[in-house]
Amino acid sequence: GNGIEKGAYGLPWYVNDGPTYWNTELMQKCGLDPNKIPTTWDEYFAAGDTIVQNCKDVYLGTTMGYNTEDLMTAGVKSFMNDDHSKYTFNDEAGVKQISRFVELYKKGGIPPEALDSSWSQAADLFQRGNLVSMAGSAYSADGFKQNAPDLYKNLAVGPRISNDGKSASVAYEMLGISANSKHPDVAIDFARFVTNEKNQIEFDKKASVFPSAKGGSG
């Protein structure tokens, strides 16, 4: 399990990785080489500039740099000081990274929706052909295949953008029990049932995610 402050406790359920999806048809249209998928932040922002120069109403993506991963992979080393009394991500690397997103947004390489877009809105824009790239999940491809078959035919999958060469990005989901639960024993039994190795694997196969249970990768 995973302990949290003040005695809260959660049972690990599944983990997910986040690749970057690219619309190769739009890449060609906007002057990019589909055989050279951007992998670093310099390459990513250079692609954005190329899109702005060659296409109208087409954008690089909705990523705005506010995720911790977008800062850490650009060189930010820490987010808080040792006693957790002050944020520290406004260092040189953090300011540079956020500034690059702001500049690309002002140029028109990032859509207005990016300021308050949800995950589903980003997928909608990508499926409609307004975005050249999208930071997605392993299961996103199934949605593209079902909802946007033309996009799926022109889909390329690249690593998460990173300056450190570490493209894997594992996000995990847990099941926890509310302290105010009227039936905590039943809730705990249910959480254990859902997260046991057998049921994790069955769920993960259908959802295109990865098990957290020991031995589940087999």
Task: Enumerate the predicted regions with their spans.
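Short glycine- and hydrophobic/aromatic-rich loop-to-beta-strand nucleating segment
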Residues: 18-22, 175-177
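Alpha-to-beta junction loops
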Residues: 55-58, 128-137
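Extracytoplasmic/periplasmic substrate-recognition and gating elements
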Residues: 28-33, 106-107, 146-210
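Hinge/lid segment of periplasmic solute-binding proteins
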Residues: 1-17, 93, 152-156
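Short helix-initiation/N-cap motifs at beta->coil->alpha
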Residues: 39-45, 112-127
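Glycine-centered hinge/linker elements that transmit conformational signals in sensory
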Residues: 45-50, 86-115
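Beta->alpha turn/N-cap motifs
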Residues: 64-67, 119, 136-144
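Short, solvent-exposed loop/beta-turn-alpha elements that line the ligand-binding surface or hinge
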Residues: 1, 37-39, 55, 78-98, ...
